Amino acid sequence: MTIVAPLGREADDPLVIAGTALRSRLLIGTAGYPTQAIMAEAVRASGAEVATLSIRRVSLRGHGSDTVSLLSGFRFLPNTAGCETARDAVMTAELAREALGTNWIKVEVIGDRETLYPDVAETIEATRQLVDAGFVVLPYCNDDPVVCSRLADLGAAAVMPMGSLIGSGMGVANPANLELICRRSPVPVIVDAGIGTASDAVIAMELGAAAVLLNTAVAKADDPVRMARAMRHAVEAGRLAFGAGRIPRRARAEPSSPQLGLVGS
């Protein structure tokens, strides 16, 4: 009997973050679903191994939240959503470590409430402090190659540049910058925010991203479970296409069939 590995999830192509190997290159959020039951079904349908959640929805008394209980067996990536200063982000990360027993943290420090753009200076400072405190830091940032390089130099385990505005569904707004970030980064690049549908995830992966993190695209879809499956296959297909290498774009046609031996030639 031949066992065929799922597309893009071959054992020899794991996503490695801080020495942890993950089969899936899709990370998924847990907020905003119609019900907790649908959330749990969609997250499992996505094939993801890492689920993000806000520390504000986790009990610090040891009872856990519905999300934690429903997703037993997943690796959790708590985030610092809602924080506007490095100080608040560090405090939230410490609470997350106490509540969930993990030193993984997704750093979000927002600098503008209308666009939810990250505050670069505060994000860099939070990353510096949290790395020094022994956290595995995955910072959300803008799609700036210099910022991503600085975060990696500080010890971030991965960088998470935005595809476009959080929750916008606009896809990858600046593919040239994202490709440059992916090509230069010494740590995994996880495209975070703005993914609206499966084709957006494919594009992010084809540009060289190591992974995609998304939430709204699945949570707010008409059928979250079906969209989660679509995203799973999209990330896998995009990774395979990146590894295979696309043909160059040309301004004119080039026949794919051999011309030798044609009638009349």
Swiss-Prot record:
Matching InterPro entries: Aldolase_TIM, Thiazole_synthase_ThiG, ThiG
UniProt GO BP: thiamine diphosphate biosynthetic process
SUPFAM superfamilies: ThiG-like
Localization terms from the record: Cytoplasm
Cysteines joined through disulfide linkages: none
Keyword presence, Transferase: yes
Cellular component GO terms held in the UniProt record: cytoplasm
GO molecular function: thiazole synthase activity
Binding site for 1-deoxy-D-xylulose 5-phosphate: G167, A193, G194, N215, T216
Record flagged with keyword Transmembrane helix: no
Keyword entries, A-Z: Cytoplasm, Schiff base, Thiamine biosynthesis, Transferase
Metabolic or biological pathway, per its Swiss-Prot or TrEMBL entry: Cofactor biosynthesis; thiamine diphosphate biosynthesis
Catalytic activity from the UniProt record: [ThiS sulfur-carrier protein]-C-terminal-Gly-aminoethanethioate + 2-iminoacetate + 1-deoxy-D-xylulose 5-phosphate = [ThiS sulfur-carrier protein]-C-terminal Gly-Gly + 2-[(2R,5Z)-2-carboxy-4-methylthiazol-5(2H)-ylidene]ethyl phosphate + 2 H2O + H(+)
Highest taxon, organism lineage: Bacteria
Pfam families: ThiG (PF05690)
Family: Belongs to the ThiG family.
Function in brief: Catalyzes the rearrangement of 1-deoxy-D-xylulose 5-phosphate (DXP) to produce the thiazole phosphate moiety of thiamine. Sulfur is provided by the thiocarboxylate moiety of the carrier protein ThiS. In vitro, sulfur can be provided by H(2)S.
PANTHER family on file: THIAZOLE SYNTHASE
Protein name: Thiazole synthase
